Swiss-Prot record:
It comes from the Eukaryota. Residues 33-42, 99-131 are extracellular. Its main location: membrane. InterPro entries: CASP_dom, CASPL-5. Homodimer and heterodimers. Expressed in leaves, exclusively in hair cells (e.g. differentiated trichomes and immature cells). It is a multi-pass membrane protein. Residues 1-11, 64-77 are cytoplasmic. Belongs to the Casparian strip membrane proteins (CASP) family. The keyword Transmembrane helix applies. Glycans are attached at N39. This is CASP-like protein 5B1. One of its GO terms (cellular component) is plasma membrane.
Amino acid sequence: MKKMIGSPGTMSGLILRLGQCATAAASIGVMVSSYDFSNYTAFCFLVASMGLQLIWSFGLACLDVYAIRRKSDLRSPILLSLFTVGDWVTALLALAAACSSAGVTVLFTKDTEFCRQQPALSCDRFQISVGLSFFNWFLAAISSHTMFWILI
């Protein structure tokens, strides 16, 4: 098996997973703290998707910590297949949620100027949360590509 940056059970893999956890948690926190987000399906999907990403990344980060402390190898083909499929699923969900939320945010801020008509709406927070979710997707894409290349 190849040893690459971001491999499971390495310090770089742990840093990648912790980055995914941090951006997912920040995206959820910013979105949930904004006013009236729950009335829009795309924003609820973003919170659900980032919640799944947070759980998945935290679980794999804990597994990385365990492997680093025990100096064990997590690169068996069965584990790598599981990690690859899980990373691809969570990365695609994160991308879909980020894109749909970005579409709604652009519609509110640029196209209809709904944010100017409704000053109580937290459009700046929507934009920050969407930006964090795109950064989360970028980290998830790196992780999923790394897993795929280690697997083949």
